[in-house]
Amino acid sequence: MTLYQPESGYSYNSDSLFLYDFISRFNPKGELLDVGAGCGIVGLLLGRDFKTVNVYGVEKQEHFIKYAQKNAQVNEIKYKLFQSNFLELEEQKKYDFIVSNPPFYPEGVQKSEDAVLLNARYASNLPLDDFFKKVSRLLKPHSHFIFCYDPTAFSDICTAINRVKMRICDVQFVHSKENKNASLVMIHARNGSKSMMKVLNPLIVMSENEYTQKIKEIFLKTDTQSIKCQL
């Protein structure tokens, strides 16, 4: 998949590819909304590989809108994009899947002065409670919410998810190496579920200075090529 990205500033990284792989295990279908779509990478990969899914994206930064539209066009994927702050998105339409790689840099991390980076990275732009409340209002009954986040916020995530009557069903932590602390957590939650939480085997990125076999498989499956340009 060819993906156009801005020449400078925020670019997608491997977190989005890992999230795509995690979402894939739940066989997405029906109406799917990608929150904070950026250049469209997560939603477009799902639209490419799951033919029974109708992909929508919401992105508030005009800077990214034209890249997401261009990427949908060149990859010939049907993709409807809303330019909106997610918290202000109209609620008439309901979704079977909501997925997101949201901003999650915590308070206390030195903030960029670049407005695009500021909006794309920092959790203060999409607080957990507000985020989850909005998701709960946009999901159909017994639907799926799948996202990644800073693993140090896992306790806060569990508390906030419970407040909106959703249940975490599956969790996978990502580690750069086997002996390193987790750098990412990927979470599958549902509304109306009574399932016990499953903690999946961790996703290990590197082993002895090379990518693990699983990571190589993810990169091969996603098959993305990035083109930095100015649109």
Question: Language-model features: where?
Answer:
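SAM-dependent Rossmann-like transferase core, predominantly class I methyltransferases
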Residues: 1-31, 37-39, 44, 48, ...
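Conserved beta-strand segments of alpha/beta enzyme cores
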Residues: 2, 54, 78-80, 167-170
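Conserved Class I SAM-dependent methyltransferase catalytic core
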Residues: 3-4, 8, 12, 126-182
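Residue-level signal for inorganic ion chemistry
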Residues: 19, 101, 131, 189
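Glycine-rich, phosphate-binding/catalytic loops in enzymes
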Residues: 20, 114-117, 163-164
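Conserved SAM/SAH cofactor-binding pocket of Class I
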Residues: 21-91, 97-111
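Mobile active-site "lid"/loop adjacent to the S-adenosyl-L-methionine
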Residues: 103-130
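SAM/dcSAM-binding transferase cores
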Residues: 181-231
